[in-house]
Structures are given as C-alpha cells and as structure tokens.
Amino acid sequence: MRKYENIYNLLIMKHFTALTIACFSLMNTHAFEPFANISIGAVSPDDLDASVSGFGAAAVPGTFELNGKESIKLEIGLKDDSGLSVGIQTAYNQMDIEDVSILGNPIGLALASLGAWNPAVPFDASGEVYTIPVLAFVGKEIPISDLLSIDLGFAAGYTTVEARPAGDLAGVFGQGNGNSWELQAKIGLDYQVSEKYSLGLDYSYSWLTGPEFGQAIAEDLGHHFIGASIGLNF
C-alpha cells in the first residue's frame, strides 16, 4: 500500500514541478523582482495515528496526541508585475507530545498489561515533534485596494520529521527521524507599508505523508499555521 502511495506522491510532485516551471517561464515575459517573507506564528496539528511495534507479536494502532507550538517560516523568491511568484520556502515547526494511546488505551495501561509498568504510577508521555520542510511554491497576489492584497499560494516538497520522546516515553520510544512529502495551501492578507515593505496575516494548511521513525510507522499528518508576516521587496 505504501508503495502505491509513494508512486502517487511522486506523480503529484512531477505535475507540481511542471507547473512551477511553466509559471517561471511565464514570468520571463514580465519584469520581476526578488522578495523575501518571514512569518512567525503557531501550528495547530492533528493527532498523529501510527502503527506501533513493541506491544506484542504484531504492530498495533496507536495515537500520538499533539499540541502545536511556535513556528517560523521563510520564503525567498521572484515576483513579476502581474503578482505571479515562484520560490523556495523553509520553516521550523515545533509540536508537543501531550499523550500517547495504544489500542485506544493510555500507554501506561498498555504497558501494565504486558507487565512492563506499574499501573499505580502515572506515566509521563511527553516529548516533542519537529518538522523542517524545504518546499517549492507558486503564488498569486490579487489586489483589493491600493494598499491591500490577497496572497494565494501552493507549495510542495520534502520535509524532515523528528520525534524526541521525553519523560517515561523516552524509555519506550527512542528518538527518531523520518522524511515525508508535504503539500501546502496558503492564503494571506498583505498591507503595503511602503514600496519595499509589507505586513500581513498568513494562514496555511499542510498535509504530510506518513513518516517512519523508530518503532512507529505514522499515517498522514495535517497541521494548520496562522501567523504574522513581514515582506521585503529588493
């Protein structure tokens, strides 16, 4: 199943690459300028479902309950006088592991059923998950007044996912790294402060294919981002 999922993701990336090249070719017919955007905000992730080994003879379903934390995003690219843009995006997203359940039960009870934990002792199932994407993006700026504009964008690329269990959870799951394909859709509202600077609000939703790290083979992960941005035109 994962083999066909990888083929599907590669097809998506192939079409997105073709779209990016087409947009860049179109830009060659217009005057364009380099720009950079920095967005600072927070992510709000979905819970991460995974197939977890180490709890019996076969892998069992588990859920990592995630809570979003800070996020910082950087975009560098080229924009033409029609508002079309292409470029590269990277980010640093941090999420906390709030709890872990195995077969619908708290992980402490799951371990107790195997004789590996005292059920009378609270289990500290904490930790952190980080994602660091490198994405190519295409965007379109749509003016709604002389100073305000709506910024639409779509990005795709490769993402590193790192899990760092802490507390008692670190004794069950080791630290692990995995990689995912990521697709992202974005909408923003920008205010042009001057010819060179703009301020804005950004919202995006990212979808990541399931990373594999340590004892967990994760399913797809989604997370929301909302933050404030500052833009610089060179």
Language model: regions and residue ranges:
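Sequence/structural signature of outer-membrane beta-barrel proteins
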Residues: V43-D47, M95-I97, Y158-A170, G178, ...
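Cleavable N-terminal export/targeting peptides
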Residues: M1-F35
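Conserved binding-pocket/active-site segment within a compact domain
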Residues: E162-E182, K186-Q192, Y197-G200
